[in-house]
A protein has these predicted regions:
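Acidic, PIN/NYN-like endoribonuclease modules and their adjacent C-terminal/linker elements
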Residues: 1-3, 97, 101-129
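Active-site-proximal, substrate-binding regions of enzyme catalytic domains
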Residues: 38, 47-69, 73-76
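Short, well-structured N-terminal submotif of metal-dependent ribonuclease cores
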Residues: 1-35, 45-57
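Histidine- and aromatic-rich ligand-binding microenvironments
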Residues: 6-7, 35-36, 89-90, 111, ...
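Short, hinge-like loop/turn segments at secondary-structure boundaries
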Residues: 50-54, 82-83, 125-128
Length: 129
C-alpha cells in the first residue's frame, strides 16, 4: 500500500481525541503516513501557541513530501469543481489534493469535498474503519 497523506482535519480530530481519528495511532506506528509543508503550516502555529511541543515533535518527525504546484492544474481543478457544483474548495485544499495525486498517495481527510473530487481527478482517498 502507498503512503497516506494525512490532512489537517484528521490531525485536529486526532489531537481532540475524536473516535474516528484514533486509527491514526496504528498508521503512525506502521510508518504509513506522510505530510507536507502546507499541512504543517496549518497545524504547527496553533500547537506552538498552545505549548504542545510534544505534538509538534511528533509532526516534524513524519516524512514530508515536496509540494510542486502546477498552477495550471490547480486552475483546471477549480474550473472542474465549479462545473460540478463544488464552489467552496479553497486553494490550499486543491494544492493538497494535487500533491496527493502527484505523489500517488492516498489522502486521509474528514473534509467531504475531497470525496466529491476524487472521481474527476484520480484522487485516491484512504477509507478508515
Amino acid at each position: 500500500m502507498n503512503k497516506i497523506l494525512v490532512d489537517s482535519s484528521v490531525w485536529i480530530g486526532f489531537f481532540k481525541g475524536q473516535e474516528e481519528a484514533k486509527q491514526l495511532f496504528q498508521l503512525i506506528d506502521s510508518n504509513m503516513i506522510c505530510t507536507n509543508d502546507l499541512i504543517m503550516t496549518e497545524l504547527i502555529p496553533s500547537l506552538i501557541h498552545k505549548n504542545e511541543i510534544e505534538l509538534v515533535n511528533i509532526l516534524t518527525s513524519i516524512e514530508k513530501v515536496t509540494i510542486e504546484i502546477d498552477w495550471n492544474g490547480i486552475t483546471q481543478m477549480q474550473i472542474q469543481n465549479l462545473k460540478n457544483g463544488l464552489n467552496r474548495v479553497g486553494v490550499p485544499d486543491l494544492i493538497i489534493a494535487q500533491n496527493a495525486i502527484q505523489n500517488k498517495l492516498a489522502l486521509y481527510s474528514f473534509d467531504k469535498h475531497f470525496e466529491l473530487m476524487k472521481k474527476g481527478f484520480g484522487l485516491t482517498m484512504f477509507i478508515g474503519r
